[in-house]
Amino acid sequence: MTESATSTSVVIGLSAVVVAIRDGDAVVLTVRPHDAITDIASPLPGLPFGPFDPAGHRTFELGLRAFVTEQTRFQLGYVEQLYTFGDEGRDAPRAEMGAGAARIVSVGYLGLTPTAVETRAPDTAWAPWSAFFPWEDWRHGRPALLDEVLAPALKRWAGEDVGQWSRARLAFALDGAIWNEERVLERYELLYEAGLAPEAARDRARAEGHDPAEPVALSAALGEPMISDHRRILATGLSRIRGKIKYRPVVFELMPAEFTLSALQRTVEAIAGVPLHKQNFRRVVEREDLVEGLGRQDADTGGRPAELFRFRREILAARPAMGLSLPLLRD
């Protein structure tokens, strides 16, 4: 194959954002891929990923399910396609993909599971996504790092550019702006553009022809870096599910078959990253007629026994476009 043919060839990669709830927190399945030559695990986590094999995979989704199980010994349940990532210059794991000099186009998927089952696969772990985006968790109030770390850094970046500061202010709810939990991807990409995301320095060095070391966290406030552009893909997945729970009942893909309304609220709060008003949340659930009482109680609540419910999955046939509005708990 000629050099020009090689440089214009394309390899399709598949990446999975697999989300579960564990101990009240949203967690994501991560892997540490091994170097193709040294067989040493990466110092940074990434998402489960692998190449699409048109000879062996009938569809993208089947290919995704196959390599996620192979890498993590975990079987995916609910899956939906997220986005296609194909920007030139992406720091993609070429050796692991067998890509050589080919352009890598990644198709991202979102997977939801009710249980963060320990995979027992080496270099695989469930990690709280707040480790990667610590500014996204408002369940216990406004994160101090927004005003103590991010605001000063973004002001230095914006300088005298009013437009850039306006973008940062609106994205991160600075100077009185209102927080929008769905703008996860916009916030990460703004940090990347400002050079505050550690992956940005790595990618700039590579674009200049250098062989940079893996990025390290510049500050805990900026989140743990990931391999390739996997943190961008993860941000896309978080944005998607935060928006989708409001118009599709996908949150029930994260719930067991039987649950209490308190457990349902904690799950929604873990995903949305904001505290909800208990009574108003229950009114929303009752109004949408999404759940049905089982006439039994869960005694394992640490307090007064609570009624058990189930998701009325049969309602999807009549009302597929429904979700849960978020009645926020105001200060």
Residue ranges of each PLM-predicted region?
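A mid-sequence, solvent-exposed acidic-amphipathic segment
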Residues: 208, 215-254
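Long, intrinsically disordered, low-complexity Ser/Thr/Pro-rich regulatory/activation regions
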Residues: 103-105, 111, 289-331
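Active-site segment of metal-dependent pyrophosphate-handling enzymes
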Residues: 54, 62-202, 244-251, 288-292
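Conserved Nudix-box catalytic region and its N-terminal flanking loop in Nudix hydrolases
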Residues: 25-74, 82-88, 244-269
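Long, low-complexity, polar/charged, intrinsically disordered or flexibly structured peripheral segments
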Residues: 182-220, 224, 228
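Short beta-strand scaffold segments in enzyme catalytic cores
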Residues: 14-18, 109
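Acidic, metal-coordinating catalytic segment for phosphate/diphosphate chemistry
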Residues: 1-15
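Charge-enriched amphipathic alpha-helical scaffolds
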Residues: 275-294
